Amino acid sequence: MEIKMKNNFETVIGIEVHVVLSSKTKMFSSSKSSHTDPKNTNISPIDLGHPGTMPLPNKRCIEKAIVLAKALDMEIEKNISFDRKNYFYQDLPKGFQITQQFHPIGKNGKIYLDENNFVDIERIHLEEDTAKQTKEDDGTILLDYNRSGIPLIEIVTKPCIKSSTEAGLFLKKLRRILTFNDISDAKMEEGSLRVDVNISVKPIGSKEFGTRVEIKNINSINNVEKAIEYESNLQAEQILKQEEVLMATKRFNDKTLTTEFMRLKTTNVDYHYMVEPNIFVRKISDDFITDVIKNNYTDIKSIEADLLKNNVSQEFINLLMDDYELFQKFKFINDEIKDCNEVIKWLCVEFVGSLNKVNLKLKDATDFQLNQLLKMMKYLLKDASINAKQGKEIVKLLIETNKDIDTLIEENNFKQITDKNVLRPILEKYVEANKPMLDQYDSRPERVEKFFIGMVMKDTNGQANPNVVTEIFNEILKLNK
């Protein structure tokens, strides 16, 4: 059935993304913008919708929206205005939401998925969040107004996405733009990036769209992909069985990996949009836009190009670009070490791997541990005072004990032996005892060299500097020719 559905139907997908902007204050008030503080502590009369209060747009949020519009190659609206979206709900104290219905700050943009494919962005607009509601067991609804007025930007695509894979890639590319440009931390698990997906299925080649189903508030990119796959197959199966596909709002159950009915969409809701009379239209100049972009915009393509130029594999480029926190730590170390692949090896593989072994994540690592990792890498790569095997053990112990590198080296006797006067007699001892092996050097150079270096490393409990041992070995070879 699944193969038949895929061969006969195509999926049409549109995505709406709500992003919490990185801002110290709310969209229209001076209240602190944070939803992690004790409930109902970051509030003001404006956030509570008291009569007579006057909203004042957050300039920093407007600047972030301009940067996003630039990153999405959009037309930037120079007359900044706001509108009222009128509806009643418990979490909306004013009875309306301030948004940008008539003149969105950006329109007609795109995100490239690769060189040839892109997703059309219809519009981006600024708006305020609603209060957070919690339902008690007895049906009582509690409201936390800390979230009321938190600045949001909504990104709306055109219905041009064709598959779950494209949808997932679009969200990854968007998240890169948001994090690298300090627009948002875009943490889906914390609600900073919320995704609604509109899905319809139609026979291949049909000019008419199928019935649209909206899936609300999906909490991870992986779940977005799974929700699209399930709902697409469900709709195709309904069409094949000649069952009606209902226009509905659904949620995704990440335990059963299915979509669940919430409510029917019977009619288009009329929100009676009107211009917000308490906020004057503000005209922004070309010079202002240029300055904002110059001071805030980060070109992600140039970062990726630099990594490629430094022979970083596409796999690790994706790893760094998809995790801004990891990239920041990578950049911090690489600014000193100046060797991308060595930093990736020790940070992304050894350091993160050691964290995972004790059930920790990168966010749990301290600045002290990161600085100690940098110090260890300097000892290894610049001073050659420790070797790679010792480095791996040091990273492991750093995570387990949180001790400084010098203490770990001292306690574990990891100080490398680099003195030729100490190492030469050890190597000569093994050369003298294994003359037949040395005689095989011309025919099997790598094997012979590895054998003698290995003997010295074993004799010194891994403390001999292998580069110094190699130098001594080459000197002995010349004397024996």
Curated annotation (Swiss-Prot):
Catalyzed reaction equations: L-glutamyl-tRNA(Gln) + L-glutamine + ATP + H2O = L-glutaminyl-tRNA(Gln) + L-glutamate + ADP + phosphate + H(+); L-aspartyl-tRNA(Asn) + L-glutamine + ATP + H2O = L-asparaginyl-tRNA(Asn) + L-glutamate + ADP + phosphate + 2 H(+)
Pfam families to which the protein is assigned, alphabetical: GatB_N (PF02934), GatB_Yqey (PF02637)
Record-linked PROSITE patterns: GATB (PS01234)
Molecular function (Gene Ontology), one example: glutaminyl-tRNA synthase (glutamine-hydrolyzing) activity
Region ranges (Disordered): 29-50
Family: Belongs to the GatB/GatE family. GatB subfamily.
Protein name listed in UniProt: Aspartyl/glutamyl-tRNA(Asn/Gln) amidotransferase subunit B
Organism: Malacoplasma penetrans (strain HF-2) (Mycoplasma penetrans)
